[in-house]
Amino acid sequence: MARYLGPKLKMSRRENIDLFLKSGVRAIDSKCKIEQPPGQHGARKPRLSDYGLQLREKQKVRRIYGILERQFRNYYQEAARLKGNTGESLLQLLESRLDNVVYRMGFGATRAESRQLVSHKAIMVNNHIVNIASYQVAINDKISIRDKAKKQSRIRASLELAEQREKPTWLEVDIVKMEGIFKKIPERIHLSAHINEHMIVELYSK
């Protein structure tokens, strides 16, 4: 499945929740009727079966993290091999992606912008350039902005926006040095309450 390149707000309206695909400069409800499905008149949503609800939940999480279907399935299979709760492990793997950590640290206004920073070689891990968005960040890894990229206005603007968001407890960020430490794997209680990972596990367990 190809990556979706259409209107970002349309996806949030489809899922009836803010997927954090926009920068957050303006509240999403000031841009569109988030509770109203996409379409000229907001077509009524059909009542979904259990399978339909599980599928929608998977699509929602995929869109939040910007993951393609095959890659998402691979993450699930890896999570299933790990000890502990499969759903929680899945979210922890997604949260440990380099593009997501860059976003959480505030260097990118969105995950898509953070992915672009990584692919454009603006990000370093332990003082080495890493341009793979799916790179799995490990505990105590240092994530930093390359010196030549520190003057980018979008990075500075993103850091200002990040000050308005709740700061992740599993990260330590120095906005002056434009670097941060991945202190620990986030616990489920610290991640979005709007995600029902158990439905995804049920979907893939069939």
Swiss-Prot record:
The record's listing under PROSITE patterns reads: RIBOSOMAL_S4 (PS00632), S4 (PS50889)
- Write down any Gene Ontology CC term: small ribosomal subunit
InterPro entries of this UniProt entry?
Ribosomal_uS4 (IPR022801), Ribosomal_uS4_bac-type (IPR005709), Ribosomal_uS4_CS (IPR018079), Ribosomal_uS4_N (IPR001912), S4_RNA-bd (IPR002942), S4_RNA-bd_sf (IPR036986)
Q: Which residues form the S4 RNA-binding domain?
A: 96-168
State how it assembles: Part of the 30S ribosomal subunit. Contacts protein S5. The interaction surface between S4 and S5 is involved in control of translational fidelity.
Q: So what family is this one in?
A: Belongs to the universal ribosomal protein uS4 family.
**Record protein name field:** Small ribosomal subunit protein uS4
Q: What is the protein's species of origin?
A: Baumannia cicadellinicola subsp. Homalodisca coagulata
Designated gene of the protein: rpsD
